[in-house]
Amino acid sequence: PAIKKLMDEVMSGPSAAEEREGPLAAEHHLLAAARKLTLFAAGVASQRYMQALADQQEIMGALADCIMEVFAMESCLLRAEKLIAARGEGAAAQAIAMTRYYAAKAIATVEHSTRKIIAGAAEGDMFRTQLSILRRLAKYEPADTISIGRQIARSVMAAGRYTL
């Protein structure tokens, strides 16, 4: 049902998505995109292989990568939001930075794994159609992971350990 709902959404075109506010609004958008990409990848794989999907180890591995990244991204977001609620945005700056960094890396992993699944499960016109759907689902502004990573590193070096 979730895959069918996603495919209906994809075929109907862009919709007015729920806009979140706060320091992690962009990361919530990335999480939603990662979920959609994962459902799309699962749909592509199940459509192609049906009952034989369990025999496609590389496809199953790529799907597992997507699922793990979605789970970890959501866990990271929820933990950061909990810290923001408890300590305030300023005191949770390190958690916000780490969440931004991880979300940027995770969406790239999900997108790459989805491409791998599409390449293994489709060909010809269907392949091109599914790639265009992937591009639409994976629209996001890339984060400056270099600056964010340096900010995290400075904080860790100053404290002599990870601080959260």
What would you call each of these model-derived segments?
Residues 1-164:
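Flavin-dependent oxidoreductase catalytic core characteristic
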